[in-house]
């Protein structure tokens, strides 16, 4: 029986990965709709943002964190929400941090280079530096830690790895990873977890960045569908 309908874009949409991963692990069958902004979708999210969710019982949710927490909580024995209230609060803390202080800034670095919004070299550089400031916080935090919260995998790891996958898809080549070994180690660890790998494309790392702060070569309408969709929607939920 279908548990609910999830509205998203095709491919590894950065704010949807954790939702898909936890749903699959919990045995919850989701009807994945990859053509957003249909009337049904807009009845849930008036702004047409993804992800959006409607349960088989007609319960509606938008905002990625809310959906991820709701899907995870369907398993009352889950270990993904922490061992106690403090760990639960930390999980939400890191989800919020990545969702606001990394993804939003990173997409302002990304969208101009994809030709989705006007390109300005100084603005791209500004947002790249702002993103790195936030990533530096995580890099320092992970110096002597394997997981973001506690001593086992949590929803924070799944959700935040999905968020920062944009960086590893477009920007984070070998040189960057050498300069940010803790974040890189953590990201690779999460990507190889069966729960995460089961719903994502084959894991690959860049040797060189795909984008290095240059004007887009293609017009917006010819930007690869998946890359543009991932980038645009990363700013919207």
Swiss-Prot record:
Binding site for glutathione: 37, 49-50, 63-64, 99
Keyword Transferase: yes
Functional pathway: Secondary metabolite biosynthesis
Segments for region (Disordered): 208-237
Cofactor annotation: glutathione
Domain GST N-terminal: 2-79
Biased composition (Basic and acidic residues): 208-222
EC identifiers of the protein: 2.5.1.-
Keywords: Transferase
Annotated GST C-terminal domain residues: 84-222
Signal sequence, start to end: none
Binding site for substrate: 49, 108
Pfam families in the cross-refs: GST_C, GST_N
One annotated Gene Ontology cellular component of this protein: nucleus
Induction entry: Expression is induced under hypoxic conditions.
Phenotype on disruption: Abolishes the production of pseurotin but leads to the accumulation of deepoxy-synerazol.
GO terms assigned for molecular function: transferase activity
Purpose of the protein: Glutathione S-transferase; part of the gene cluster that mediates the biosynthesis of pseurotin A, a competitive inhibitor of chitin synthase and an inducer of nerve-cell proliferation. The PKS-NRPS hybrid synthetase psoA is responsible for the biosynthesis of azaspirene, one of the first intermediates having the 1-oxa-7-azaspiro[4,4]-non-2-ene-4,6-dione core of pseurotin, via condensation of one acetyl-CoA, 4 malonyl-CoA, and a L-phenylalanine molecule.
Name of this chain's protein: Glutathione S-transferase psoE
Originating organism: Aspergillus fumigatus (strain ATCC MYA-4609 / CBS 101355 / FGSC A1100 / Af293) (Neosartorya fumigata)
